[in-house]
């Protein structure tokens, strides 16, 4: 790691804080999020996006205090959205919660530093403001609106786009039947590739361990699912009997889902809490359908 190391006592734990320049930070980020062997233009684009995101968060922290995650809880709904929660003593953390930052050992090609030098100081802006640039490794063929995923703020530059060479016709993915057809299909999206040469060029080894990231499925017996949901969000539904889509975003991602158990029925959202609720870690996406057969819930 570059820079200086600061150790502080934070709530009876020691916290290590790495103090370094923006560009040294980005040197690690763009080779931790993606691989240092990625093409030059890919690395340049990543540098601009990651620089923009970081500066937007720092600027936001100057004006917004308290938590960056919010709740709306009543007897019928549990709605939560996450963002970069307020790190009181540092700007960003070192994992996917903010951006991956794994030190300079990942930046083992000259192309990484060259990409930073070529884009030094460059950011994305919209109407004079630095963009809150978000990114993912695989969008499943279509991206979602910012306000459907995070806080209810509309950013016109973060809207639905299709990830394809030409405008891929998806239909209205807010419609359940259209979304179902889309989710069960394999459209010709850029991120739909099994080419090992491409994947090994742009993904670090730990990301290549995931084989089925474009379309996937996971199954749970009802008893296991009920225990998992109780453990993840602390709400006792009893035995879960049904999971129903209530609202989907423009990309088909679920924003609100109704869980029906023999003790309780509740609607949960937004996107990330849905993904966390139905997985030990998190589902790859909330663009899924649920099928039930013989007491087994299968998420596609």
Where are these regions (language model features)?
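Conserved, single-site charged/polar hotspot
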Residues: 1-300
């Amino acid at each position: 790691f570059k820079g200086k190391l600061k150790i502080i006592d934070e709530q009876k734990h020691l916290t290590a804080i790495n103090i370094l320049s923006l560009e040294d930070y980005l040197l690690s980020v763009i080779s931790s999020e993606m691989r240092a062997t990625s093409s030059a233009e890919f690395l340049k684009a990543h540098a601009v996006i990651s620089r923009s995101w970081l500066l937007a968060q720092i600027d936001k922290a100057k004006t917004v205090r308290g938590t960056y995650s919010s709740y709306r809880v009543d007897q019928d709904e549990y709605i939560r959205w996450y963002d970069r929660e307020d790190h009181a003593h540092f700007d960003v953390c070192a994992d996917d919660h903010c951006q991956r930052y794994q030190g300079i050992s990942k930046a083992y090609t000259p192309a990484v530093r060259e990409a930073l030098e070529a884009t030094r100081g460059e950011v994305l802006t919209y109407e004079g403001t630095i963009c809150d640039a978000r990114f993912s490794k695989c969008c499943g063929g279509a991206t979602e609106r910012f306000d459907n995923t995070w806080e209810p703020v509309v950013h016109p530059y973060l809207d639905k786009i299709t990830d394809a060479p030409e405008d891929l016709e998806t239909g209205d993915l807010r419609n359940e039947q259209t979304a179902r057809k889309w989710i069960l299909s394999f459209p010709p999206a850029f991120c739909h590739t099994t080419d090992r040469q491409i994947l090994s060029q742009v993904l670090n080894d730990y990301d290549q361990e995931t084989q089925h990231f474009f379309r996937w499925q996971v199954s749970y017996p009802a008893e296991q699912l009920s225990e998992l949901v109780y453990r993840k969000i602390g709400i006792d539904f009893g035995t879960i009997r049904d999971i129903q889509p209530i609202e989907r975003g423009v990309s088909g991602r679920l924003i609100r889902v109704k869980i029906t158990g023999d003790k309780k029925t509740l609607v949960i959202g937004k996107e990330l809490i849905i993904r966390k609720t139905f997985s030990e870690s998190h589902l790859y996406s909330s663009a899924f359908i649920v099928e039930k057969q013989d007491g087994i819930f299968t998420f596609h």
